[in-house]
């Protein structure tokens, strides 16, 4: 962008701002949106959804895109069964979190114990909508049109520094309060985007999705 075009762009933006009265520029309160999402989450015993996950890391080149089906059962069971790359799994069985990714690290599975208290557990959605007023500062971004309705977009920043991310922007469906998209800025430098479709709430989840038995010959690495 040249200096002249940059100045022209700033002048145009200033003209737009001056055309609206201050009341039109007042930031919308994000908390009613988050309260709606939190209330909805409390009614969910189990959930499943198709997911597309994109992880971008400028240090390693092109973004990595994966797909599959996500499962959740409160309070501490969570799973991601990947169809691309096929065979990869993430399983939280209530006691352990299993990370099995033969597509990148064949011959091993990483196992870590789930803390019994003090966290939401390995819960992709719940970490953002359980007690959000206690855990985050929030800013309303804008509304967005979805294929099946409208979503409100809110950016969250953790109040404490012990989270593995510095910010998360979430899309909350206006009609039912379900989270449909998450863009997470991780402290590792990665940006992770997860988009959920075909959400099914309280329709039951097969118990096998929350169990993991290491295949023969696979080494268990405890962390």
State each model region's role.
Residues 44-46, 65-67, 73-75, 85, ...:
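Extracytoplasmic
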Residues 1-10, 23:
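Bacterial N-terminal signal peptides that target proteins for export
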Residues 51, 78-81, 97-100, 156, ...:
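Short hydrophobic/aromatic-rich beta-strand segments that constitute the beta-sheet cores
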Residues 13, 23-63, 77, 214-223:
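N-terminal leader/targeting segments and the immediate start of mature chains
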Residues 108-110, 124, 133-223:
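Gly/Pro-enriched, hydrophobic low-complexity segments
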Residues 69-121, 192-195:
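An acidic-aromatic
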Residues 9-19:
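Bacterial N-terminal signal peptides
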């Amino acid at each position: 962008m040249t200096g002249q075009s940059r100045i022209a762009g700033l002048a145009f933006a200033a003209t737009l701002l001056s055309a609206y009265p201050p009341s039109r520029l007042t930031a919308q309160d994000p908390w009613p949106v988050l309260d709606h999402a939190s209330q909805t989450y409390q009614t969910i015993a189990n959930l499943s959804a198709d997911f597309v996950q994109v992880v971008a890391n400028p240090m390693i080149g092109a973004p990595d895109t994966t797909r599959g089906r996500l499962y959740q059962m409160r309070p501490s069971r969570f799973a991601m069964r990947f169809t691309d790359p096929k065979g990869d799994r993430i399983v939280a069985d209530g006691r352990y979190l299993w990370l099995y990714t033969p597509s990148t690290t064949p011959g091993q599975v990483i196992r870590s114990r789930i803390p019994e208290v003090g966290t939401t557990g390995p819960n992709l959605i719940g970490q953002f909508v359980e007690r959000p007023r206690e855990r985050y500062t929030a800013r309303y971004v804008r509304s967005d049109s979805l294929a099946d309705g409208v979503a409100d977009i809110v950016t969250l920043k953790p109040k404490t520094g012990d989270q593995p991310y510095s910010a998360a922007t979430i899309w909350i469906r206006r009609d039912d309060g379900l989270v449909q998209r998450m863009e997470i800025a991780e402290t590792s430098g990665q940006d992770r985007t997860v988009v959920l479709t075909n959400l099914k709430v309280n329709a039951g989840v097969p118990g096998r999705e929350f169990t993991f038995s290491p295949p023969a010959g696979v080494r268990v690495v405890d962390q």
